[in-house]
Amino acid sequence: MPVPRRVLGLSLALLSLVASPAVAAEREGCPGLVASGPAYLKQATLVERPGTAGSFLDRAARPEGQVGLTFVGHATFLVESPKGVRIATDYSESTRPAAPPDVATMNKAHGTHYSLRPDPRIKHVLRGWNPAGGPAHHDLQVEDVHIRNVSTNIRDWGGGTEYDGNSIFVFETAQLCIAHLGHLHHTLGPYHLRKLGRVDVLLVPVDGGYTLETFDMMEVLKAINAPLMVPMHFFGPSTLQRFLAAAREHFPVEFSPQASITLSRETLPQSPKILVLPGH
């Protein structure tokens, strides 16, 4: 259901007017983490892990400084911290890991991004919207992971704006800042970029219509400038290839043979690139 570009542009312009001009300086650090070193350290060496997306991954501790990332499907990733904390993004009835995570994040734009009946064994269910109204606010520590959110707006079903209906969730662990854009419906102004801080790994919806048109998503990617960007929320090869055709004008593109990879601060790319994990 493609929509006109920049349908929320007016509200974003107003946010930009009140935002601090010192955005770049504030984004040098990842809030809540010490990040005094250079943004990029050396060329990435992605360590593949056996298994398929959504397979059972036990809660064994990982080597210090290493974070597991598995593309389960649609907008759901499984993030595993060095101490074994397991986080499922945009956890829903249709797409979820085989074993219950410790933390589940959700967004409300469509039913494929949230669950009305999350597994009761999940210790922390974090909704990207506030059922009582206003923005959701999450700021919690789960062992070695700091989790927070940045609220954004969504289109309502009448074509208007539902304020604070989506959250960009940020997971900070092992000196990495991993941001999941959720069901993003508008570009990001200085206010959002300041709240995000430094982003090392960006999980990006690339459908080109239900979320953002591809042109606008490119603007988001360039503004955040994360070393590693991983596509999600595409509905088959044609949707993905349309995004990648536009992305190649700005970033190198690589493909992983495995849906599960290992990330670390030491192996971040020296310059931004897109890595495609198998699945959809």
Annotated model-derived regions:
Residues 21-155, 176-181, 200-204, 237, ...:
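Metallo-beta-lactamase
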Residues 9-19:
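Bacterial N-terminal signal peptides
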Residues 229:
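Residue-level signal for inorganic ion chemistry
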Residues 100, 224-225:
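Short, structured coil segments at secondary-structure junctions
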